């Protein structure tokens, strides 16, 4: 079996397939990995404006989950909502392709930034992440941001910046960050 350390896979030229790529935290992940020079493919259950946006960036997105969608991938990334019975997860495992959780990927990405802010907790994560984003953007630091709600300043729940700062609203699920 291939290495089970996601840090071995987050590198330019590596091929990742994202299951549920149209999701609120998966689409910015796809953009960040694409911007970092990775070859990204993905799948989602339905077409959407988000899926069309990813396609416009040159990221192929299949509609529907089928085992053949993971062909050529070196790793597969999924959300916790995608179970082992999913045909793409089952096909990846059968082919020896490592499967990682979305939060593991964000954790690996964070390590590539000079400044990483990760907001966690029971209540107020979105508000606190929004406030941090406003402050960092006012300081003209051009951060990459992933937030759990739509921030009017961004017009969405994320932005792919060009600076050395990343701000993430994190989830403590599985202690994966």
Where are these regions (language model features)?
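Phosphate-binding loop of NTP-binding sites
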Residues: 32, 55, 69, 80, ...
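N-terminal leader/targeting and accessory segments in enzymes
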Residues: 1-105
């Amino acid at each position: 079996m291939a290495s089970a350390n996601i840090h071995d896979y987050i590198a330019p030229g590596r091929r990742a397939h994202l299951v549920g790529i149209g999701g609120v935290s998966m689409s910015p992940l796809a953009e960040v990995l694409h911007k970092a020079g990775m070859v990204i493919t993905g799948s989602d259950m339905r077409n959407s404006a988000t899926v069309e946006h990813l396609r416009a960036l040159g990221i192929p997105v299949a509609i529907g989950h089928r085992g053949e969608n993971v062909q050529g991938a070196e790793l597969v990334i999924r959300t916790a909502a995608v179970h082992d019975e999913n045909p793409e997860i089952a096909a990846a495992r059968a082919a020896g392709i490592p499967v990682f959780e979305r939060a593991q990927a964000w954790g690996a990405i964070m390590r590539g930034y000079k400044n990483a802010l990760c907001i966690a907790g029971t209540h107020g994560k979105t508000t606190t992440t929004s406030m941090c984003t406003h402050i960092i953007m006012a300081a003209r630091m051009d951060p990459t941001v992933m937030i759990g709600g739509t921030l009017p300043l961004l017009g969405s729940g994320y932005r792919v910046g060009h600076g050395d700062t990343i701000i993430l609203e994190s989830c403590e699920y599985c202690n994966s960050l």
